Amino acid sequence: QLGTRKGAIAVYMEPWHMDIMDFIDLKKNSGEERRRAHDLFPALWITDLFMERVLEDSYWTLFDPYEVKDLSECYGDEFKAKYIAYEEDATITKNTMKAKDLWKKVLTSYFESGSPFLCFKDTANRANPNAHVGHIRSSNLCTEIFQNTNPNHYKIKLEFMDGTISTYEEEDLIVVDGGIAKKANKVSALDSVNGKRVFIVEKEKIDGDTAVCNLASVNLSRINTKEDIERVVPIAIRMLDNVIDLNFYPLRKVKATNLKSRSIGLGVMGEAEM
């Protein structure tokens, strides 16, 4: 940051992740050093269902995220229904432990190292004013910013020998001739679909949404009367909104997200000097 301050990153994980136990230990001062990441800030994206299991002193199931990708795409009752369905699915890889044992490990690590940070997925999404255009997947390093984000993904375009074209999401299943189901991103020019030979496979990257913080503070040591606050706050809000339009953006997708959401935050500082 301007060559004077190191950057920092917070990594969020949901408590059903198979690697959650190792993740919690990332900043521990003891143990095997190669399994530590002291410059990262681990954080948990906790669901209501997990806390319910803790209160009930019941069991909690851990999954491989590759097998349950949609758990990260939902919250609330939808998450609960899918999670329980995966628990009952005998074909899914899983580990089971007491929810309270995992919670005790979280709290022990928190008191020892100050991490992981704790944020609550369902609470954040229930209060999301932009729930109609997406959902919140994590917070930031300071755990006060909650914005919609989306990962990058790819569209797969198959052009066949007869000149026809079909487009798929990369995870879509396609039954190729021979009866084998392949993900769209695994189909090649050696395959045929519905009797049509694939000629060209093209991959198009679709940018996701990256949250941007547009922040400022009012210095209460200088601005502290009712008249001053009523005068300065509207100006500060307009200034922050102007910054969105005038700012330099290192990535195209960052600019697109900021222009779309126009999220701003105005805080205060200098209370001790009032």
Language-model region placement:
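Active-site cavity-forming subdomains of large catalytic enzyme subunits
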Residues: Q1-S166, D172, R197-D207, A211-S217, ...
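Core structural elements
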Residues: W16, I237-L246, T257-M274
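Hydrophobic face of alpha-helices
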Residues: W103, E230-V233, I237, V268
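Acidic, low-complexity, intrinsically disordered interaction modules
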Residues: E171, V175-G179, K183
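Extracellular interaction modules
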Residues: S188-R197
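Amphipathic, non-membrane alpha-helical segments in soluble helical-bundle scaffolds
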Residues: K205, K226-V233, T257-I264
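Alpha-helical support elements that line or immediately flank enzyme active sites
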Residues: S217-V233, M274
